[in-house]
Amino acid sequence: VLDLRTYNSRFSSEEVQQSVIESDEFAYNMPIFFQDKKSYISKLEKNNPYLKVINIESKFPNTLSIKCMDREEVFAIKMSDERYFILDEDLKVLEVLTSFDSTQTNAILLGGEISVDNVDASAGDFLTLNAGQALIEAFVPAMKLNNRDVSEQKALFESINIRYRNNPITARSEAYLELYDFNGLKMCIFEAEDMLVNKINCLLAAHAAFDPKDAGTFELRILKDSNGDIFAHQMQKS
């Protein structure tokens, strides 16, 4: 008989943990080494949108150990006036809402030149973006490497837009991040696919020194000079 155990330091509730243990997806009458663990992970993720299954280990003679953790709300994408996807850093749909306003404790609104491939996704699915996916997926880890956890990221940024432009020096098309804080300050990280961790570090330092009352007059730009050095430029709005 299969003995199912869960190991997890960050379950949100005993109810969630119990629902995993009692899931009818598991083949309790099948030998341990014939269990389809990939299928279990897929089904658990779909049926429990806020759950992240890290791995499932087989332990002789009859134990499956499931290591899980909570997923955190990070991003929101507006699909229509009454349809918003709430996403984690892996772009998993945690919820579908009919309305959404970004605050310092909920998700950061994503926009700009991005489009969603699977527009009919529902809670538990993973989104695929037609453009900008790699950059969005790199943003949260880059922030964490700058010692900003998810709650701090949400407190800093109201919205993030993916934009494209022709680089004025190389004339090549490049992606950049256009970010807004809750004072309305516009911040741009140019050539965002290059040295993003360092550029975010520069942005955070410049933002900390910026006077919020100037948010309507200036914007911050994070650039790289011809020597490869990253710097912040405070530019007056036209």
Q: Residues of each region from the PLM?
A:
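Charged, solvent-exposed interaction patches on well-folded alpha/beta domains
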Residues: 1, 21-43, 52-238
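Acidic, glycine-rich low-complexity/disordered segments
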Residues: 1-19, 117
